């Protein structure tokens, strides 16, 4: 993977069950982070949220930090907020979702890590109060030849259909404008 020119990876650390609300460690997390760090690839993490309140967001952030301990995490720990099939958080208002995201990010920051938010361009416009997220790393997903998000952003996910030698299947492709 490193030989393909990949110099950073954002690895899923875990997620909250869409229906049950249970916290689940990604079954490939340890293998993925160990492989990336062994290859000299800088890593960040993301947690796929289905938190419906601040307390659940703090639980998610705490789990992510607990699993991150012992690894060199130089990129942010992101909260991934998007719609899920029958997702328990799908019906949150824009303001309630923003409160959840801020609680996650502040917990991550209080734990000594960089904090960030991952969402699509339309999600930032319609489901989050993006102006309330200043100070956190903003990672925008927009599968296009250029990112047209008008707000400040630090990373851009431009494809979900990338190919990287050493990884089976499609890979999300990203550009980081900050070195971390």
Where in this protein do the model-derived segments appear?
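Structural recognition of alpha->loop->beta junctions
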Residues: 65-79, 83, 127-152
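Short secondary-structure transition/capping segments
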Residues: 56, 60-63, 86-100, 120-129, ...
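Functionally critical loop-and-helix segments that line ligand-binding/catalytic clefts
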Residues: 3, 131-180
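Short beta-strand/turn micro-motifs composed of small residues
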Residues: 47, 119, 142
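Hydrophobic anchor at the start of a short beta-strand
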Residues: 43, 114-116, 138
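Substrate-binding cleft of extracellular glycoside hydrolase catalytic domains
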Residues: 2-111
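Aromatic-lined carbohydrate-recognition surfaces of secreted/lumenal glycan-active proteins
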Residues: 108-126
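Flexible, glycine-rich phosphate/dinucleotide-binding loops
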Residues: 17-18, 52, 124, 147, ...
